[in-house]
Amino acid sequence: MLDRQQTGIVFNVQKFSVHDGEGIRTLVFLKGCPLHCPWCSNPESQRREPERAYNPTRCLTAAVCGRCAKACPTGAVSIVGGLVCFDRSKCTGCNACVRACPSGAQTVYGETQSVDQILSRVEEDGVFYTRSGGGLTLSGGEALAQPDFALALLREAKKRHIHTTIETCGHYPTEVLDQACRVLDALIFDIKCLDSARHKKATGVGSELILKNIGHVFEHFPDLPVLIRTPVIPGFNDTEEDILGIREMIPRKANIRYEALTYHRMGQPKYGYLGRRYELEGVKADEAFMKRLNIMLKSYEK
């Protein structure tokens, strides 16, 4: 199969991003992730398969509409007390409710698309990439959780002279990362915690493979621009020892940068849309600590 014909499951294409790589970029979000971080801002990305979601803030209300319940052939969507209710155990994934919904309250996260389809959308903004040094960033979920599709996207983008970056959690076979780095222009790599037991308790996997993979990048792709990022999560890795320990293991080179990211809850509403509970309810970032931490991190840049 030609690279441009390869297909994968994508849940969002976001244009005009300026925070996920150099210049103005188009972000392509792929479904699936080997980690299950309770602070994840894209919970709809974690499972590989498409997922049905309901956003009540966009609903026209059962009194005005109710088309989703009428369209559902299994009774998974119903009207109870004037409210739209969803029984996931009865849902067969036919998406009749989604097609019937006029407001977008009923939706599906995840759609099968080809490399050609994705890059056609990416290329629409080619003039912005040229002027800003931007391009394509693969994200997720995990950008390499669908390795065949992701690698085909990167190779085909390279043929079309599109600057490429991936955002990655680093947990997959080293050979996959090696293949990606051979065609990447830059890499954004998360390191959340050096303590493997603590990492596994929080995310579901240990940190050994992640650290092995970033070590592989440092050794075999020494000139690749790399941004290492750590989300600072209260109660998980919010100590000077944790963050400075990660910074210490990163080579001090001009092409390697490090960022500690402040915890936020911008993705919290989506947990409700998916029928899940947000486990960090009420948790807030310590702004004073982050300010002190960033002052300390600046000393590594000298």
UniProtKB/Swiss-Prot annotation:
One of its GO terms (biological process) is alkanesulfonate catabolic process. S-adenosyl-L-methionine binds at W39, C40, S41, G141, D190, I191, K192. Its EC number is 1.97.1.-. [4Fe-4S] cluster 3 binds at C72, C91, C94, C97. [4Fe-4S] cluster 2 binds at C59, C65, C68, C101. Binds 3 [4Fe-4S] clusters. One cluster is coordinated with 3 cysteines and an exchangeable S-adenosyl-L-methionine. Pfam families: Fer4 (PF00037), Fer4_12 (PF13353), Radical_SAM (PF04055). Residues 50-81, 82-111 form the 4Fe-4S ferredoxin-type domain. It is an enzyme of class 1 (oxidoreductase). It catalyses: glycyl-[protein] + reduced [flavodoxin] + S-adenosyl-L-methionine = glycin-2-yl radical-[protein] + semiquinone [flavodoxin] + 5'-deoxyadenosine + L-methionine + H(+). [4Fe-4S] cluster 1 binds at C33, C37, C40. Belongs to the organic radical-activating enzymes family. This is (2S)-3-sulfopropanediol sulfolyase activating enzyme.
